[in-house]
Amino acid sequence: MTHTKRTFALIGIAAAGALTLGLAGCSGNSDATGTDDAAGGDDLITVGYVAVGPEGGWRDAHEQAVKDAFTKDAGFDLKYAPAASPTDQKSQLDAFATFVNDEVDAILLTATEASGWDDSLKLAQEAEIPVILLDRGVDSSDDLYATRIAPDNVTVAKSVGEWALTSFPEGANYYVLEGVPGLSVVNERNEGFDDAISGAAGWNKVGAQTANWSADEGKSVTETVLKANNNDIQFIFAQNDEMGIGAAQAVKDAGLTPGTDVKIATIDGTEGALKALAAGELSFVAQYNPFFGDIAVDAVKKAIDGGSLEKVIIVDGETFDSAEAGQAALDAGKGF
């Protein structure tokens, strides 16, 4: 799709050479939604997708939902550029610069880090390319991007805290398994949970540590915490399902019963977490809905046409607080 833009020479020869490899999959491999077919190319809206790439069940479901929404049949040529690793910001900055230099019509961005995006976003703005943030926010002025589409991390995490208060009316020793440091999602989930339990009597935070969204790290961190505290932990808030599932295994390995001796609450709502909830190994799962590709499609079209968008578009989700609720969610196909 052709739009009038100002053209900028944004990247030098060396950077462009490196990006040829980094974006090779955007139009050629099986992971890419877009291709460079000549037929009908001028009629398609070209969208660069600066993505995180493989990181876990939620991320896989979310990125696939975006790919499924931005198809050629829907009028798009999607250029998918996953980060070299889930924490590699440089590859994302390079991909973003390439998309601006290639004069795509819009950019979707899920940042591996919240900071460091000002210059990139300013270049996109100067080139009149709207940027839509998916899931994660950035530490930049909101006039540098069109909108952010995401479930409300603060509200989702607050639901965990509110459930915990009702489950432990006299308080508890608790531990928090956090995601990758520096991400907006981590900060927001801490904020929501802390807001919910702030001032409640009897709540003792034993500590918090990153487990990098990983089941293995969630297990190892929990093992260490239980040993260091003579198993005197009643509640674990895992900021994603994988870490919570790992924590449940550590609880069992310590000779304790998850759901009875130690309650574990998680955020995401993957099929694995719902199965663990149905089995009694998790006690609470807050869904962080990954399926908002269609919302992103509408936002891109509106941004390109010069329409106004809310700066934050909230994606709704659900909570599941019992084995029965977990099984019902599975039966309804709500896992991913």
Locate each region found by the language model.
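Short beta-strand elements at the ligand-binding edges of bilobed clamshell
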Residues: Y80, S140-W163, V176-V180, A208, ...
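Hydrophobic alpha-helical segments within soluble ligand-binding/sensing domains
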Residues: Q92, R148-Y174, A215-K219, G269-A273, ...
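Hydrophobic alpha-helical
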Residues: L109-Q125, F193, A211-K275
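Hinge/cleft segment of the Venus flytrap/periplasmic-binding protein
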Residues: I13, D43-L44, L177, P181-V185, ...
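Extracytoplasmic "Venus flytrap"
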Residues: T46-D73, K79-D94, T110-A114, E178-E188, ...
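Flexible loop/hinge segments that line or gate small-molecule binding clefts
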Residues: D119-T155, T166, N173, G269-A278, ...
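Periplasmic-binding protein-like
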Residues: G48-A51, E103-A111, P130-L134, Y175-V176, ...
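Bacterial lipoprotein signal-peptidase II cleavage site
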Residues: L23-A39
